[in-house]
Regions:
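Beta-strand-rich recognition/accessory modules
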Residues: 82-90, 313-360
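Extended, loop-rich substrate-binding clefts of extracytoplasmic carbohydrate-active enzymes
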Residues: 172-251
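Bacterial Sec-dependent N-terminal signal peptides
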Residues: 1-25
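Solvent-exposed N-terminal domain segments of exported/luminal and surface proteins
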Residues: 99, 104-205
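Acidic (Asp/Glu-rich), glycine- and aromatic
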Residues: 243, 254-288
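Alpha-mannosidase-like glycoside hydrolase catalytic domains involved in N-glycan trimming
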Residues: 21-114
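Solvent-exposed beta-strand/loop surfaces of large extracellular or lumenal domains
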Residues: 54-83, 235, 279-298, 314-321
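Short, well-ordered beta-strand segments enriched in hydrophobic/aromatic residues
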Residues: 25-29, 130, 245, 256-263
C-alpha cells in the first residue's frame, strides 16, 4: 500500500455570529507520485466537537473550488468509534484544501456495493467501480461444494454490475463466466485460498476452513463497504481454530483491506497468506510468474487466457513476511501469529483488459 496521506486540521470560527463554524482540512501528499481518488480519514468525534453538531444535523465537504465532494461515515471495525472518509486527489509533494461545515449534502452515486446472494446459494459478493469479489456461503456448502477462498471478478466498466450479472446469469440470458462487454468471472478458486486469503499453516500444510457461516455488512457505501464473516471451527494440526474475517473495499481501490482473527488453544500459530496457482507445476513456473519481497509483497500472474487475458494478483502485508515460497499449490507469505491478535493486510488484483498490463 502507498504511504499515508497527511491531514492537518484547522477550525475557523468567524467573528460574525451568523456565520457557520467551519473546519479547514489540508491534505498533504509527501510522496513522489500523484495520489488520485484516495481516501482521507478523520475522527468523526473531532468533527462533531469542532462544529458543535447536534443530532439530525448534516455536514458537507467542499474543495478549493467550492464544489461538494462525496464522504461517508465509517466504523473502526472494532466498534470503538466512527471516522469520516472523503475522496481526494493530491499531486506529488502538493497539498489540497477542503472545508467541512454544516449543510445539506448532495446525492452522490454509490461507488461500492455488496450483498448476500441467496438466489445463488448464499454467495456474498461485493464490488467497487474497478473490480468485484465474492466468497462462498452455507447454502453452497450444503451441496458439497466447499471453498474458503476469495473469488475475483474482472471488470472493464465503472458501473456496479453485481445485480445485473447475477440476474442475467440465473435467467440464462448471459453467463457472467463470459465477457459480454463489461467483464467476467474467469478466476479459478475451488478448494483453495483463492486471491490472498489467510489460513493457519501447520507442518508445511495450509489448514483451510469451510464456507462462511454468517456475513454482516458493517459499512455500506457510498465510498466503502465492509463485511464481517464468521466461520465454523476447524483444526490446524491438533489445534481447534475459530476464524473471523473483516474485509473492506474502498472506491477506486484495487485492494481489499483484510483483518483476520484466529482464536486457538495455543499461544502461537503460523499463518500463511496465499494466492492460488491453478497450474500443474507451480514450483517450476514460479520464477517467471511470481514476485515476492519479504518487506511484505507476494504477487502472481495467472496463466494467460487467450480470449480473456491475464489477472495480476497480489497480497501486501505492511509488516512484511518471514518466509515466501510455493506450497500446497499457492504462492504464500508466512508469518508467526499470536491467537486473538488482528492480522491486517491487503489483497487484490488487476486485469490486463482493464488497463493493468503488468505488475509495474
Amino acid at each position: 500500500m502507498k504511504t499515508i496521506l497527511l491531514i492537518s486540521l484547522v477550525v475557523i470560527f468567524s467573528g460574525c455570529a451568523l456565520t457557520k463554524a467551519q473546519m479547514a482540512v489540508t491534505v498533504h501528499n509527501p510522496s513522489s507520485f500523484d495520489r488520485n481518488y484516495e481516501m482521507a480519514e478523520i475522527e468523526w468525534k473531532e468533527i462533531q466537537k469542532k462544529l458543535n453538531l447536534q443530532s439530525g444535523e448534516n455536514i458537507i465537504i467542499t474543495n478549493s473550488s467550492n464544489e461538494q465532494v462525496p464522504y461517508q461515515k465509517v466504523t473502526n471495525c472494532d466498534y470503538s468509534g466512527e471516522n469520516l472518509i472523503f475522496l481526494t486527489s493530491v499531486a506529488a509533494g502538493k497539498e489540497e484544501s477542503y472545508t467541512i461545515l454544516k449543510g445539506k449534502p448532495e446525492n452522490f452515486q454509490p461507488l461500492v456495493y455488496g450483498r448476500l446472494v441467496p438466489e445463488r446459494k448464499d454467495d456474498f459478493t461485493w464490488e467497487n467501480n474497478r473490480s468485484a469479489f465474492r466468497v462462498y456461503g452455507p447454502a453452497l456448502k450444503a451441496t458439497g461444494e466447499i471453498s474458503n477462498g476469495m473469488d475475483y471478478w474482472s471488470k472493464k466498466t465503472e458501473d456496479l454490475i453485481i445485480d445485473k450479472w447475477y440476474e442475467n446469469d440465473l435467467a440464462k440470458i448471459s453467463s457472467y463466466h463470459s465477457d459480454h462487454g463489461e467483464g467476467l468471472d474467469f478466476y479459478k478458486v475451488g478448494r483453495t485460498l483463492g486471491l490472498g486469503m489467510t489460513a493457519p499453516f501447520d507442518n508445511d500444510t495450509l489448514c483451510l476452513g469451510d464456507n462462511f457461516v454468517t456475513a454482516e455488512i458493517i459499512d455500506n457505501g457510498p465510498l466503502r463497504i465492509t463485511i464481517k464473516f464468521t466461520y465454523d471451527s476447524y483444526f490446524a494440526g491438533s489445534h481447534a481454530i475459530k476464524e473471523t474475517r473483516i474485509i473492506s473495499l474502498d472506491a477506486y481501490s484495487l485492494f481489499n483491506k483484510v483483518t483476520n482473527t484466529f482464536e486457538a488453544d495455543t499461544t502461537l500459530l503460523t499463518v500463511a497468506t496465499g494466492i492460488v496457482m491453478p497450474v500443474d507445476n507451480p514450483e517450476e513456473i514460479a520464477e517467471t510468474t511470481t514476485f515476492g519481497n519479504n518487506s511484505g509483497i507476494i504477487a502472481y500472474e495467472t496463466p494467460e487466457d487467450k480470449q480473456n487475458g491475464t489477472i495480476f494478483t497480489a497480497a501486501i502485508h505492511p509488516k512484511g513476511f518471514n518466509t515466501i515460497k510455493v506450497s500446497d499449490g499457492h504462492y504464500v507469505g508466512i508469518n508467526n501469529y499470536q491467537p486473538g491478535d488482528k492480522y491486517n493486510y491487503f489483497a487484490g488484483g488487476g486485469w490486463s483488459k482493464a488497463g493493468f498490463e503488468d505488475f509495474n
